[in-house]
From Swiss-Prot:
SUPFAM superfamilies: beta and beta-prime subunits of DNA dependent RNA-polymerase (SSF64484). The RNAP catalytic core consists of 2 alpha, 1 beta, 1 beta' and 1 omega subunit. When a sigma factor is associated with the core the holoenzyme is formed, which can initiate transcription. It comes from Malacoplasma penetrans (strain HF-2). Pfam families: RNA_pol_Rpb2_1 (PF04563), RNA_pol_Rpb2_2 (PF04561), RNA_pol_Rpb2_3 (PF04565), RNA_pol_Rpb2_45 (PF10385), RNA_pol_Rpb2_6 (PF00562), RNA_pol_Rpb2_7 (PF04560). InterPro entries: DNA-dir_RNA_pol_bsu_ext_1_sf, DNA-dir_RNA_pol_bsu_external_1, DNA-dir_RNA_pol_su2, DNA-dir_RNAP_su2_dom, DNA-dir_RNAP_su2_hyb_sf, RNA_pol_bsu_bac, RNA_pol_bsu_CS, RNA_pol_bsu_protrusion. The keyword Hydrolase does not apply. It catalyses: RNA(n) + a ribonucleoside 5'-triphosphate = RNA(n+1) + diphosphate. DNA-dependent RNA polymerase catalyzes the transcription of DNA into RNA using the four ribonucleoside triphosphates as substrates. GO terms for biological process: DNA-templated transcription. The keyword Transcription applies. GO terms for molecular function: DNA binding; DNA-directed RNA polymerase activity; ribonucleoside binding. This is DNA-directed RNA polymerase subunit beta. Its EC number is 2.7.7.6. NCBIfam families: PRK00405.1, rpoB.
Length: 1375
């Protein structure tokens, strides 16, 4: 990793950048889309079949019939991706499952056969669902719209050690617990705690009942007894610890108390009088045990002492205690006694309470830890987690009895590594078996645990305490007794400061649910409902359901077929709902390539089972040290979703358990190797990791001590202690943040805005890549999915190119690439691909062959490089406003194209069919002048608001016509009487040019929705130039609205006559602390000035045209023309050498040569790359500016001091006071355009209820004049304005109609009437029992009934107060 100033790095055939990166990267960057694509393929290839297979075979209750799984097949898609987009359909593949029904009595097997209705398929089997398929871009096409499923970040299942936790109950209630707590969180099942409360010295378990209405708490020993452990075994495992003894004292499951319970007393009484024919269900086993207990006790009393019988009696007593404890737990937790897994039954039909408990806690159907949960449980509950820095209270021996670590040894890192290694190999003699009853062993198999004794206090070393670890050989994703024992031990150990609390916000405790897991969950939900349906049908079929059993007389029975007992609708609905309405399924953001790629790498903490956006908790939203290299600390939305929506870091991926991982280079004995290892957040906590931008030479650190991170701290470590080093500085941030140059010089809040606003950049008609980039631009554009990329396995040669097609020949094969041409994106931008290869060009796999929107030569090009000055100008750039030169408007520098789709359906109605026609009633000829003979707009027509796009008439309700009327209608074609006009018209603000019309008819075999005869889609294109009110931004969070577009001649200019393009307010920089924009400004100008010297250097070095193409991104033909024109101008000026050319050949001469060659000056740029955290520093910038002839220190070259220049006002010709910072900045035009926002209302819709105008542009609504605005007018006494606003402009229905009529007839505006809101007030008063009447004139009413309130008040104050009532009135009026 040798340190250089810069290298000229070739990124592709047309892209070369001056690269200032300081670190060599021998790392193949993974494709940025692979994460979700690989997850979906994993689901389709393996998990889908496994999920479907899991519910089969399904057997009937009587056992006669069983439904067997044979196989499944995904057929080829019905339509291509392009057809699905065009027709508004889903790109999917039909899934068929082959099943067979077996009659176990007759041995008959009936398979599913191909349906006669299913002509499209050759597959035998039942149609299960059409499953949307992922495209090469990593998206799904659902109903013609591209969608994407974002990943969800959730808490991982497993065990968590906390000081406070809660169980959520129904009705938004919670049960909060504090103390030493271990929370057992399953992927499926009920969360429960094992804890020691703050004020108690024994261990308890808290469960939530199956209904979720309440919690139930019992001592841990009661739970262990319910699982089949007896008192002696419990005390032996936990070495008679006081907490366990106290737990035993606090429960009733001992011989004395259990046999005194009402249940067993009643059982003793009724034991002999029981009915032999009666079924006792689950209680049968308890009765049998009690019978055996009574019998053995009687025998012992009769025979005297008998050791064998006494032992057998003790076993029976323990079994009764266990069964009784299990029964109480089943009842208190409302656990279902049905659907018990066969492996937990003592025989095929016998069910005990213990088997119900085992089924509830140890079956993956009811309590699934998942693979990730098992990994977390094993990691947390292993012995090594708690042994570090503890002193052994016994010799640690291997399985052969050899002492490995002696007693009284303090366990350090070396000893811990030895214990981990021997445990992994199974050679350490610390494994013990739990003594369980034989019948329990059948359900639990052999239960093992690991145990080592350590001293309670390292100093005193008098008393020891056992540390119990779980069985690390377990690999099933279920809970085990071993886990319960190790958790109990952990809670006990916490009282002695043994063990660690978990940080719930640590990324090691969170995992990603990718699309495979989300789809698997949906598939399982659908299969559960299918299974229930099949069970019901099979129960009826074999006569188990007596109420529906057919009698013998009704024979012969209908033959049973697979199709008659299965309903796959629930499975189909599951997938349909997921891709249409699931919270994590979103419209793909196609604003630009960066927006699309970022959308695909987004992760959300919201969604089903996630966090609500209303949750005010800041800890879950905050940046955590474990996010390093996995989640970007910068890119997140502003507002309610901050910290809940995140972006993956540049190199982040996931492991097989869904935990986020990031790559590191391994360091061995202070030497950096090329070996890469991917680490999770939990693994990182065990290592010392160096940052990548250290002084390194020949893979060795230059210093003896280097800055490294260990967990959350940054410290200096000896190089021999370093385990790993970062791959690259940019692995900390997301792709959007890594495309901001000088990110390290920006405040994080502004960097956040910069990253977010790049995603809002509108693709321009002539995009140009940034002169100051970060080197990421090519990778982002390449992986976004918007560029056309050659994907052939072998190298090829371009054989044909035109605007819409590229053909590449590889050997005897020829691949044809149809380019996307002027398609509408989800955000209504123009998605267009342009070839960048030429015939005869060699291409390799992964080469970009065509640019998409916002791309230039395969690089991301979101905006334009413009000349920016930081200066004020007549106050027009006050408060971040932007002043623009008219050149940018005239030359279409910031012009963009937008495409809007308008759709209309021609339907079958109960009154008759709708009709597409040009003959539309009550529509003027001017509104339909561009319609063709069929009533559809012609392509190329310029349409404005209100113009008809598709003429359509719909039949009115049936009206009986006389024969004469029918004849007249037939002769004159008068459709106005029985048809109404329902044409598709251009909405408000929708004017533009018709670009394309698509027609889909049922008669042409298109699949349309029910009752749709024909569907017509019209695409209207708008060409939007930059204008006042549009929003622009840089890449550093420096945003503003265009306040003025100034003629070029009035703009300030440099001394050489170069006019400024944009003026920004200098006050927008210091307080925002985004200094990156200033550094970009200076470096950009330096690189632009260096372009001239680089052109001359290449010319005098006699470089070929291909080199010009590489350095400046222009095509070879243009390069050849440029060389010819350069030669002509140099000869005219009699310039003979490079030195002479550098002095005499000016920027104007270059512009002249470019103009003659047909090349824009903006497109000829010598670009640079300054990667984040390792790019251009202060020294590099000074050197680049000096090289370009801009002296950054003292202005000796006379053209600028510190990059500042003397500006001349274009209006007056006078110099500005002081020097101004001028340079090249990359500016973006954002999606917030004034055309989409500006709106006015004259006449429009009104609310049905309030009769007030609606609000918002979409509803052609008005601007609300609210309560406070009314107060303002009242304060000024603006009575007439108020009257107008509160009546005819609001809800005076009669008044506004009269006013409208008066205006169009040119008459004076009449008096306003009574507003609806006043009527509402009177009704509310009447509702209070007050009689309210309205009189128009005071004189016509009985004057005695009215009093002037002011007169009343003055009268009663002047006269003596006569009674308390008047006194009370005056006090209330505060007189």
């Amino acid at each position: 990793m040798s340190k250089k100033k810069f290298i000229d790095k070739e990124i592709s055939k047309y892209v070369l950048r001056r690269d200032y990166s300081k670190i060599e990267k021998n790392f193949n960057e993974p494709n940025l889309l692979n994460l979700q694509k690989n997850a979906f393929h994993k689901f389709i290839d393996t998990e889908l079949e496994g999920t479907i297979k899991s519910i089969f075979p399904i057997k009937s209750i009587g056992g006669r019939y069983s439904l067997e799984y044979i196989g499944m097949k995904l057929e080829k898609p019905k339509r291509s991706e392009k057809e699905a987009r065009n027709e508004g359909k889903t790109y999917d593949r039909p899934l068929y499952v082959d099943l067979a029904i077996v009659d176990n009595e007759s041995g008959e097997v009936k398979k599913t056969t191909k349906s006669s209705k299913n002509k499209a398929s050759n597959t035998d089997g039942i149609f299960f669902a059409s499953i949307p398929m992922i495209t090469e871009k990593g998206t799904f096409i659902v109903n013609g719209i591209e969608k994407f499923v974002i990943s969800q970040i959730v808490r991982s299942p497993g065990a968590y050690i906390l000081t406070k936790s809660q169980i959520k109950l129904s009705n938004s209630r919670k049960r909060i617990q504090e103390g030493y707590i271990c929370e057992i969180l399953p992927a499926k099942g009920t969360l429960f705690f094992i804890f020691m409360a703050e004020n108690k010295d024994f261990i308890q378990v808290m469960f939530r009942d199956a209904i979720g209405e309440s919690t139930h708490t019992i001592p841990i020993t009661a739970f262990l007894k319910a699982l089949g452990l007896n008192k002696e075994e419990i005390l032996n495992i936990f070495a008679n610890h006081k907490s366990i003894k106290n737990s035993l004292d606090n429960e009733i499951y001992n011989e004395k108390d259990v046999f005194e319970t009402d249940e067993l007393i009643n059982l003793r009484k009724n034991l002999n009088s029981s009915d032999s024919n009666r079924s006792y269900g689950v209680d049968t086993k308890l009765r049998e045990l009690f019978k055996k207990y009574s019998s053995l006790k009687s025998q012992l009393e009769a025979e005297g002492k008998n050791a064998e019988k006494q032992k057998e009696l003790n076993e029976v007593i323990n079994n009764i205690i266990s069964e009784k404890a299990a029964k109480d737990l089943v009842i208190n937790l409302s656990i279902s006694t049905k659907n018990i897994d066969s492996k937990f039954r003592l025989s095929n039909k016998e069910t005990t309470y213990q088997s119900i408990i085992y089924n509830h806690f140890f079956s993956n159907k009811s309590f699934d830890l998942s693979k990730a949960g098992r990994f977390k449980m094993a990691r947390k509950m292993r012995l090594s987690e708690r042994l570090y820095q503890r002193v052994l209270a016994e010799d640690l021996k291997d399985i052969n009895g050899k002492v490995v670590i002696k007693k009284n040894t303090l366990i350090q890192k070396h000893e811990l590594d030895t214990i981990k290694q021997l445990t992994k190999e199974g050679k350490l003699g610390i494994v013990h078996n739990v003594n369980l009853d034989e019948r329990i062993s059948k359900m639990a198999n052999v239960v093992k645990y690991e145990k080592i004794n350590v001293y309670q206090d390292n100093d005193s070393q008098d008393e020891f305490i056992p540390i119990i670890g779980t069985d690390t050989s377990l690999d099933k994703p279920t809970l085990s007794i071993s886990d319960i024992l190790s958790i109990t031990s952990y809670v006990i150990n916490l009282d002695y400061d043994i063990g660690f609390y978990d940080d719930i916000d640590h990324l090691g405790n969170k995992r990603l649910k990718l699309i495979d897991e989300l789809l698997k969950t949906r598939a399982q939900a659908g299969l559960v409902r299918i299974e229930k349906f099949i069970n019901d049908k099979l129960a009826i079929a074999d006569g188990a359901n007596k109420s529906q059993e057919q009698s013998e007389e009704q024979e012969p029975k209908k033959s049973l077929t697979v199709k008659s007992i299965i309903n796959t609708k629930p499975f189909q609905i599951s997938f349909k709902e997921f891709f249409n309405s699931h919270q994590l399924t979103q419209f793909l953001d196609q604003q630009n390539p960066l927006a699309e790629l970022t959308n695909k790498r987004r992760i959300s903490a919201m969604g089903p089972g996630g966090i609500s956006r209303e949750d005010p908790n800041l800890d879950i939203r905050d940046v955590h040290y474990s996010h390093y290299g996995k989640i970007c600390p910068i890119e997140t939305p502003e507002g309610m979703n901050i910290g809940l929506i995140m972006s993956l870091a540049t190199y982040a991926s996931t492991d097989e358990n869904g935990f986020l991982i990031t790559p590191y280079r391994i360091v061995k004995n202070g030497v950096i190797t090329d070996e890469i290892r991917w680490l999770t957040a939990l693994s990182e906590d065990e290592y010392i990791i160096a940052c990548s931008n250290l002084n390194v030479e020949k893979n060795k650190f230059k210093e003896d001590k280097v800055l490294c991170r260990y967990r959350s701290s940054w410290e200096f470590f000896d190089v021999k202690d370093v385990d790993f080093i970062d791959i690259s500085p940019k692995q900390v941030v997301s792709i959007a943040a890594s495309s901001i140059p000088f990110l390290e010089n920006d405040d994080a809040n502004r960097a956040l805005m910069g990253a977010n606003m790049q995603r809002q950049a509108t693709p321009l008609i002539s995009p140009i890549a940034p002169i100051v980039g970060t080197g990421n631009e090519y990778k982002i554009a390449h992986d976004s999915g918007m560029a056309a990329v050659y994907d052939g396995e072998k190298d090829g040669t371009v054989s044909y190119v035109d605007g819409g097609t590229i053909k590449i020949k590889s050997g005897s094969e020829e691949k044809v690439y149809e380019l996307t041409k002027f398609n509408k994106s989800n955000q209504n931008t123009c998605n267009n691909q342009v070839p960048i290869v030429s015939v005869g060009e060699k291409v390799t796999k992964g080469t970009t062959i065509a640019d998409g929107p916002a791309m230039s030569n395969g690089e991301l090009a979101l905006g334009q490089n413009v000349l920016v000055a930081f200066t004020t100008w007549s106050g027009y750039n006050y408060e971040d406003a932007i002043i623009l030169s008219k050149r940018l408007f005239m030359e279409d520098i910031f012009t963009s194209i937008h495409i809007v789709e308008y759709s209309v359906d021609c339907l079958k109605t109960k009154n008759g069919d709708e009709e597409i026609t040009r003959d539309i009633p009550n529509v003027s000829e001017s509104s339909k002048k561009y319609l063709d003979d069929e009533g559809i707009i012609m392509v190329g027509a310029e349409v404005k608001e209100g113009d008809v796009l598709v003429g359509k008439i719909s039949p009115k309700g049936q009206v009986e016509l006389t024969s004469e009327e029918k004849l007249l209608q037939a002769i004159f074609g008068d459709k106005s009487k029985n048809h109404k006009e329902t044409s598709l018209k251009v909405p408000h603000g929708g004017e533009g040019t018709v670009a394309m019309v698509k027609r889909f008819k049922v008669e042409d075999d298109y699949e349309l929705n029910a009752d749709v005869i024909e569907q017509i889609k019209v695409y209207v294109v708008q060409k939007r130039k930059i204008q006042i009110g549009d929003k622009m931004a840089g890449r550093h969070g420096n945003k503003g609205i265009i306040s003025k577009i100034v003629p070029v001649e009035d703009m300030p200019h440099l001394e050489d006559g170069t006019t400024i393009d944009i003026m920004l307010n200098p006050l927008g920089v210091p307080s925002r602390m985004n200094i990156g924009q200033i550094l970009e400004l200076h470096l950009g100008l330096a690189m632009k000035k260096l372009t001239l010297s680089k052109v001359l250097e290449l010319y005098y070095d006699k470089k070929p045209a291909s080199d010009f193409s590489l350095w400046f991104g222009i095509h070879e033909e243009a390069s050849r023309n440029l060389i010819k024109n350069l030669e002509k101008i140099l000869n005219e000026k009699q310039i003979k050498s490079l030195d002479q050319a550098n002095k005499e050949f000016t920027d104007f001469d270059l512009s002249l040569a470019l103009s003659r060659s047909g090349i824009s000056r903006e497109k000829l740029i010598y670009k640079t790359a300054t990667p984040v955290f390792e790019g251009v520093n202060r020294t590099d910038l000074k050197e680049a500016m000096t090289e370009a002839g801009i002296d950054p220190i003292n202005g000796k070259l006379g053209e600028g001091k510190s990059g500042k220049f003397n500006l001349i006002d274009g209006r007056t010709g006078e110099y500005f006071d002081g020097e101004v910072s001028v340079g090249i900045m990359y500016m973006l035009k954002l999606d917030h355009m004034v055309d989409d926002k500006i709106h006015s209302r004259a006449v429009g819709p009104y609310s049905k209820i309030t009769q007030q105008p609606l609000g918002g542009k979409s509803q052609n609504g008005g601007q609300r004049f609210g309560e406070m605005e009314v107060w303002a007018l009242e304060a000024y006494g603006a009575a007439h304005n108020l009257r107008e606003l509160l009546t005819i402009k609001s809800d005076d229905v009669k008044g506004r109609n009269n006013t409208y009529n008066a205006i169009i007839k040119g008459k004076p505006i009449p008096e306003s009437g009574l507003p609806e809101s006043f009527k509402l007030l009177t009704k509310q008063l009447q509702g209070l029992g007050l009689q309210v009447s309205i009189t128009k004139e005071l004189g016509k009413a009985n004057n005695n009934n009215f009093k002037d309130i002011n007169e009343y008040i003055s009268n009663i104050t002047n006269n003596a107060i006569k009674n308390d009532e008047d006194q009370q009135i005056i006090e209330e009026m505060d007189i």
